[in-house]
Amino acid sequence: MMRPIPAGLLILVFLVFPSGAGGAAEAPPDSLVARIAAAGDSASFPGEDLVLVLDVTRVDVEESGLGHVRHRTLTKVLTEAGARALATRRFDYDPASNLIRIDTVRIHREDGTTEAVDPSTAIDLPAPAHLIYWGARMKLLSLPRLRVGDAVEIATYKKGFQIAYLADETEGPDERYVPPMRGHFYDVVLFQDDLPIVEKRYRLRVPRDKPVQYSVYNGPVSGSLRFAGDSLLYAWHALDVPAFEREPRTPDRTDLAPKVVLATVEDWPEKSRWFFEVNEPVFEADGAIRRKVEELLRGVEDEEEKMAILLHWVAQEIRYSGISMGEGEGYTLHPGIMTFHDRCGVCKDIAGMLVTMLRVAGFTTYPVMTMAGSRVERIPADQFNHCVVAVEREDGSFTMLDPTWAPFNRATWSRWEGEQHYVIGTADGEDLTAIRSFAPEESRMRIDGHARLDAAGDLHGTMTLTGKGISDGRLRSALADAPAWDRTGAVARLLEPLGAGVEVLDLEAVEPRDFSRDAQL
């Protein structure tokens, strides 16, 4: 099943912002007054409610790789709808691995006055959660009544990281915020948003012995590099960027919006070796796991069948539910023993369970970083949101398995995941590669029907639907998601596009968990 891109996964973000305190109202700098006036009004941006007048991010990176980010935005209200949209500001963070501080909030009124908002009035609350319950939090700050022509200035400070699959080996008061791949920094910076941007800048300072490699994608972004004593200063900016337009079936914004991808890591094999080393200890098995593997594979000789049996057991028996295990959650693969006992986890834990069981069965297996929903660029920055499994074969090739997307799907690799980029974590190091593309025929739905039209105009007949690939999963899910007593009703709802009033009189269907043959009903 496709999971929302945040889900349990491999994204690493380093952020940090400046300290400051809300104080008495003061006149804004002339440059801000001029920027707000020059930004224009609703006539300048037809159909838009807000415009991002200025977006500046400054990042200072330590030797450890810890990034300190200072972020400042200036957003102008163009319509009453925009005023309502800005009424409450939300700031997300994970207290286990990062922090955020709201330093300055000012409202620049249309009449030229400035109103300061006390950041300490923000309310700290648990963030809404669905399927992943790791203790994320948010700060909500309500603003005074806004009017068309007003502009909101916000400055924040944030540091830390958000990443899955890593072991926690850090100590000390600030060590919790140091990225797990210690000594390295990477980021993906988008230069387009859901609202138009007048000016966006991103400035990065790194130690001189930690040069950053980067590339610009999907549009013009100007950049520069300067030497500054013991530091390297990188800067990128974009001007007059239109709002990102979403359409039905639009690819992920990171595939279309102008962006800079940057990293101090040399190449993907280096990232692969690190990923292998930090995760290798979690794949140990205990007696209970060994007995279950023996039970499942008793009498089975074919290697492909063994892999499929273990894949589907993990897919069906380990529920997708991220329960916090305490310190280190969100960036640590759960040990296989823990997942087997809990019978739940997110994609990283489900993949780890399959790696553990396949190793018990004698297969050489590794965890894999991948990105479901968008491409991964050649620059070795973390661009992952999902974890899967690789089985190394005798000829050195790999067979890819994804237990998270396998529930009620016969295929051992979802046909939704064609051309998906991935990096396998091995001791020798692997490069970035991609899954092959899948032809439409691999997900074909075959429909055989025999029907007659009676004198009243009703159509009576029999229909046989046989699905492969994506269509196989569609049929199985329609059956599995319905109570056993209502499967005829579920099939009737599946057939509703054929015409109103479809009635299923009799049904013979595949058992949804029978993966020995294509789904048929």
Where are these regions (language model features)?
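Short, contiguous, pocket-lining structural segments
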Residues: 302, 306, 346-350, 459
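Hydrophobic alpha-helical elements and their junctions with loops/disorder across both membrane
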Residues: 14-15, 300, 354
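Secondary-structure boundary elements
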Residues: 267-342
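Short glycine-rich loop/turn motifs that provide flexible caps or phosphate-binding loops at active sites
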Residues: 7, 344, 460
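Bacterial N-terminal signal peptides
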Residues: 7-19
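Beta-strand-rich, non-transmembrane domain signature
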Residues: 23-265, 289, 338-341, 349-520
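Positively charged n-region of N-terminal signal peptides that target proteins for export
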Residues: 1-5
